[in-house]
Amino acid sequence: MPSRKFVEGEVVRGRWPGSSLYYEVEILSHDNKSQLYTVKYKDGTELELKESDIKPLKSFKQRKSGSISSSPSRRRGSRSRSRSRSRSRSPGRAPKGSRRSVSASHEGDVKEKKEKEMRREILQVKLTPLVLKPFGNSVSVYNGEPEHMEKNATPYKDKQERIILSTEDRYIVTQYSLRPRREEVKAKEIESEEQNLVTKGPAPLGTFQVTTPQRKDLEFGGVPGAVLIMLGLPACVLLLLLQCRQKDPGLLHFPPPLPALHELWEPRVCGVYLLWFFVQALFHLLPVGKVAEGTPLVDGRRLQYRLNGLYAFILTSAALGAAVFWGVELCYLYTHFLQLALAATGFSVLLSAYLYVRSLRAPREELSPASSGNAVYDFFIGRELNPRLGAFDLKFFCELRPGLIGWVVINLVMLLMEMKIQERAAPSLAMILVNSFQLLYVVDALWNEEALLTSMDIMHDGFGFMLAFGDLVWVPFTYSLQAFYLVSHPHDLSWPLASVIIALKLCGYVIFRCANSQKNAFRKNPTDPKLAHLKTIHTSTGKSLLVSGWWGFVRHPNYLGDLIMALAWSLPCGFNHLLPYFYIIYFTALLIHREARDEHQCRRKYGLAWEKYCQRVPYRIFPYIY
């Protein structure tokens, strides 16, 4: 392996891409695999340069005229006309000893010509917009990531957000990839793409809009992984529900016998599910609740969201109470639970197909950063980032409304069915704990609905099969598995053991809520005196990473709290079977995978600052374990 010539922190001169100009830069890091140095210019720009494009400071002689600029953002066009030119840069210098005979008007023409040549040289730099993947969520299934322990003091400083053009430069770039200058002449189609990255409007102030590139490094195993997930998840839901209905749901009786096809389909059940979905959509459209703005998109826009999830939950609860009072048979949902899950699955597939077809006509800047250009993968991950019908945001609505509120409704039905089947005058203590724990989780998510706007689901992932199936099928029908299990497999829970489980639940909830609240408070106002005791690491993006408090304990304290709560609402089911613990097993695997995605993205975005953060906070989720 070739030895490195420069070390981190060393100040050197780096060649500006596509030109012969060298500027003062600081070495941030070195990639042994690609043999590229990550450097930072004085204006904050970070590039990857080859070693041949970096020179030590001593190899440059300082000129009195200051012909070598200290920052790539400084242009010679801003110099005073009376300042003498560098000998190497003078376009028309008279022989030594002679007097300049050029008129003032001719001098201006020569200077203007020189400025145009320099601008044309710099504009030939090949530009590759870098889309940094935002992520994090503090509610529901997916919870906050370290990404949102940050606060950007300058709202549009990030390269993926709005970039303001100076009157002097008339152009801007986001992230660059250095190419040999022999390749500056490209095909016409490449040149036309570059023109989209340069703003040349006559207005003194312009806005540069970055288009959303498509990913090349596919997640979830790429296309084969997406196909397996799309086939495997519906089969998994079906097998779980069938197994739970058996008298003995142990592993020795797996797989369960499959019912006849006519038992899996009933048109009336489909009508019930559609009614539920559209009633929740109607609640979402009610003009009540706060209207919040989302994070800036790549073109600088901020979408508006109506935050009335808690109102929808209250209206749903009132409607259910009225239904019970009027004698509506809610047990219908239990007796047709399997058909209801299949109806929701079919609806999610049709919704995913609609979303993909409509995304084919969506502008490029509205596509998801996770999209790839492959039809199968994009159907799975989602091609359009924020599909909307007018002001109705389909992805935001499905994240918390039909599935999460439906989860609570299913739990209530299971509680009523336990009393009916087991001939109880009151629900069992185990059923009460399961319902109470999960109700608290859902209400907390709806109460903090605004935190969803900074989640990976909203900011990064498109709306496709992955989120549609997860929100509409996976959450309500697998997260309610403990209550479904207790209907046919009762478990008598003693009060001392119940007290321990309650304490465990409260411990997990305190960690989960305090970590997310601390993160959200720091993101909104990092100068809050209440947060003055927290230590941070500043990053080159202008944001800071928390390295004390809950976020100095582990990198994902909210994940830790989430997993403790998941264990607490599985324990009331006892230890006779493994089935009630499916959620904690699945959720652990999900959060470990999610943490790995977050780690990869943060390392690319923050570079050396993220390395320092990992040294300060070595444990990812489980302290002293992982």
Curated annotation (Swiss-Prot):
Residues 1-221 are nuclear. It comes from the Eukaryota. Phosphorylated by CDK1 in mitosis when the inner nuclear membrane breaks down into vesicles that dissociate from the lamina and the chromatin. It is phosphorylated by different protein kinases in interphase when the membrane is associated with these structures. Phosphorylation of LBR and HP1 proteins may be responsible for some of the alterations in chromatin organization and nuclear structure which occur at various times during the cell cycle. Phosphorylated by SRPK1. In late anaphase LBR is dephosphorylated, probably by PP1 and/or PP2A, allowing reassociation with chromatin. Highly expressed in the testis and lung. Also expressed in the heart, ovary, kidney and liver. Pfam families: ERG4_ERG24 (PF01222), LBR_tudor (PF09465). The keyword Transmembrane applies. The modification Phosphothreonine is found at residues 128, 211. Residues 106-117 have a biased composition (Basic and acidic residues). The chain crosses the membrane at residues 222-242, 269-289, 310-330, 337-357, 427-447, 458-478, 492-512, 572-592. Pathway: Steroid biosynthesis; cholesterol biosynthesis. Its EC number is 1.3.1.70. Keywords: Acetylation, Cholesterol biosynthesis, Cholesterol metabolism, Cytoplasm, DNA-binding, Endoplasmic reticulum, Glycoprotein, Lipid biosynthesis, Lipid metabolism, Membrane, Nucleus, Oxidoreductase, Phosphoprotein, Receptor, Steroid biosynthesis, Steroid metabolism, Sterol biosynthesis, Sterol metabolism, Transmembrane, Transmembrane helix. It catalyses: 5alpha-cholest-8,14-dien-3beta-ol + NADPH + H(+) = 5alpha-cholest-8-en-3beta-ol + NADP(+); 4,4-dimethyl-5alpha-cholesta-8,24-dien-3beta-ol + NADP(+) = 4,4-dimethyl-5alpha-cholesta-8,14,24-trien-3beta-ol + NADPH + H(+); 4,4-dimethyl-8,14-cholestadien-3beta-ol + NADPH + H(+) = 4,4-dimethyl-5alpha-cholest-8-en-3beta-ol + NADP(+). Belongs to the ERG4/ERG24 family. Interacts with CBX5. Interacts with DNA. Interaction with DNA is sequence independent with higher affinity for supercoiled and relaxed circular DNA than linear DNA. Interacts with lamin B. Interacts with CLNK. Interacts with TMEM147; promoting LBR localization to the nucleus inner membrane. PANTHER family: DELTA(14)-STEROL REDUCTASE, DELTA(14)-STEROL REDUCTASE LBR. The Tudor domain may not recognize methylation marks, but rather bind unassembled free histone H3. This is Delta(14)-sterol reductase LBR. It comes from Mus musculus.
